[in-house]
Amino acid sequence: MSIKEWPEDERPREKLLRQGPGGLSDAELLAIFLRTGVSGLSAVDLSRHLLQQFGSLRALLGAEQRAFCAAHGLGPAKYAQLQAVLEMGKRHLAEQLQRGDPLTSPQLTRDYLQAQLRDRPREVFALLLLDNQHRVIQFVELFYGTLDSASVWPREIVQIALKHNAAAVILAHNHPSGVAEPSRADRQITDRITAALALIDIRVLDHLVIGDGITVSFAERGWL
């Protein structure tokens, strides 16, 4: 049965307009994005099939182009459309943390860093630079690959902070495994960076480790 033949209060688009997006299932949200199903499957049924095939909504949204386009009911046009939607979401968060805005919401910071780092296939170490009123100066990606004491250089972080005249920073990196629990190396690197920046009176406000929908805060753990 086509979705058009469903009772109006069960149609995903009408439900979203009436209840808001938070009241819809993953399959219903995906169905609105897909708009149409395929032969024998409504858009919702196709969405359920795709979610089962990929394992989760996150896995589907983060799939590489070849795997995404190979799935029944998808293709290059849908992949391009999805990438545009995801990028607009990132830019929406970025505009809320744009240069000159005071950093007043810890949750906004988490959401922004999740959007920037969560789905990266390798580790990325980044820096959020702030002025003395905790207004955002710039977000900078610094190091890539497995992060340890040999790959993260406090001296480079000091140079970047001085270049942008930062008064404080927030450190962030992702764990591609999805497990956000900080390692011993993460804590050691943070201590080294904090000590190096303290020599020039720049505070480390937090170090956020980004996992699969989970963010661990060093500040909340009492480690800073």
UniProtKB/Swiss-Prot annotation:
What top-level branch of life does the organism fall under? Bacteria
State the CDD domains in the record. Answer: MPN_DUF2466
Keywords for the protein's UniProt record, in alphabetical order? Hydrolase, Metal-binding, Metalloprotease, Protease, Zinc
Any Pfam family from its record, for instance, is UPF0758_N
GO biological process annotations for this chain's record?
A: proteolysis
**Domain MPN, first and last residues per copy:** 102-224
Binding-site positions, Zn(2+): 173, 175, 186
Intervals of motif JAMM motif? 173-186
InterPro entries cross-referenced by the UniProt entry: MPN, RadC_JAB, RuvA_2-like, UPF0758, UPF0758_CS, UPF0758_N
Q: Provide the GO MF annotations for this entry.
A: metal ion binding; metallopeptidase activity
The similarity annotation says: Belongs to the UPF0758 family.
Q: What is this protein called?
A: UPF0758 protein AHA_0160
Origin organism of this chain? Aeromonas hydrophila subsp. hydrophila (strain ATCC 7966 / DSM 30187 / BCRC 13018 / CCUG 14551 / JCM 1027 / KCTC 2358 / NCIMB 9240 / NCTC 8049)
Q: What is the lineage of its organism?
A: Bacteria, Pseudomonadati, Pseudomonadota, Gammaproteobacteria, Aeromonadales
